[in-house]
Each structure stands twice: as structure tokens, then as C-alpha cells.
Amino acid sequence: MPLAAALLLMLSAVAASPAVAAEEALTAAHALLSAWHEDPARIDQARAQLEAAVTTDPTPETLTELSRVWFLTGDFRARTEAERVTAYERGMETGRRAVALAPRNDRAHLWLAINTGRTAEIRGVMRALALVSTIREESDTVLKLNPSNVEGLVLAGSLAADLPAMMGGDKAKAEGFFKRALEIDPRLTGGRMELARLYISAKRWPDAQRELQSIVDETAATDLPRWTVRDRPRARAMLTELRDRGRIPAAPAPAPGPSPSP
């Protein structure tokens, strides 16, 4: 949807009934977020619209989307660690509200878990043991409700990859979760990045190279904004670092052009 149309929906939602306004706010937010890489301020616009909607009609769908937008705010709009923590904590709070209204909504549990995970990352795992327990519970709930939730599979894989063994970490299980996610959605570059990170930690250099190159070469990423802003630049940088350290072969030199005519 063009940005102008999304803005019209935002304006019309102001005068609509609460239920209609919530639906229109959700539609407008989706339109804004589909191409936020073109203007990251669209994240802020979507958040403002959803905040207004949940004030009058806090539906599970709008609360869940707002929880996701708070995550995007923390990852891509916050300028300081304090702002990041605030964003993720707001995402947690909103996620809890969504779960309370719709306990069987797997996406509500997902974004509660993801925002909680980001908060734990900032605090440090050993200082956030209670949060880790919440993340694991919510992650398990996501997959119980929907075993094919792709982002839920990536989340489960990330937990298995990053937690120490004494807290449930398991590299083999992590690989299985990531591969299952990519079987369902091969163009989910965030999941492929997590798999590449796992391979690097295991010193499986050719496997890591394959996944990173696949990210760079992607032509139809599921999450285009994330691929544009984070995954592709990061994959390129990681490939360069692996080559510089001699972990993978140097990139082939470009083929010479045609000889000039005499």
C-alpha cells in the first residue's frame, strides 16, 4: 500500500468507531512497516497510531502488533541503552496485555518472549535468570500453539544456541530448529543469520559461508526492511571477516573485461 494511502487510513481512523479504528490502525501500521527501511520514522508513525488505537479498543491483534513495533523501536530507533531498555520493557508490557486477552494467540506469546529476550540480553543472562525462565516458557508456548510459527522456531533455536548447557542450551537442537524454520520459509534471512552464527561458533566455516552468501544473494526477503538494514550488511561484513582471518577462501577476482578493439 502506498504511504499516502496509509496516512489516509491513519486520519480516517481518528473519526471511526473504536473497533473500526483499531482495524484501520492495524492496516495502516502494516503498510507503514512493510517498507520502513525507506524511512525509519515510519516505525514511530506506526507506533503512535497503534498506541492511539489500544487506548480506545485494546484488541489482541493491535496489542500484539504494538509489542512488535516496540521491539523494532528498541532495535532500530533507540539511540541509547536506556531508550532500548524502555522500548523492550514497553514491548513486554504490551505483550502481556495481548496474552491476557488472547492466551492462545501464538504471536502474542512470541513478541512477549522476544522483547523479554532483548531485555535479558542487555541485563546479562546471569542477572536476568527470572527473565530467562519467562522467555523459555513463552517460547515453548508459541510452538505448542503453532508448531509451524517460523519466528517461534528461530527463537527456540536462538535459546538453544546461546544458553549454557546447564540452562538448557543444546547446539544440535538449535540447528534443528533453525533448519525447520528455513524449510518453512527459506527467505527468512534473520533465521539464516542465526544458523550462520551457530556454524561459526562450531567452526563449520564452509557451512557458515554458504548461509551468509545466501543472505547476501537473497532477492525476495520475507522481511525486506530487516534484510536491507541489518541482515545483508551484516552478512557481507561477516564474510569479509572470515576471509580476512583465513577461515574461508578469498573472494574470486572479477573476470577481466573484453580486450579493447585495435
What annotation goes with each model-predicted range?
Residues A16-D75:
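N-terminal leader/linker segments that initiate helical-solenoid repeat arrays
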Residues P40-Q45, R79-E93, M126-E138, M167-R180, ...:
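Structural signature of tandem alpha-helical TPR/SEL1-like repeats
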Residues T59-P60, N105, N149, L188, ...:
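Residue-level recognition of tetratricopeptide repeat
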Residues T62-L63, A108, G152, G191, ...:
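TPR alpha-solenoid repeat register
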Residues S201-K203, Q209-P262:
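Terminal, low-structured helical/coil segments at or just beyond the last alpha-helical repeat
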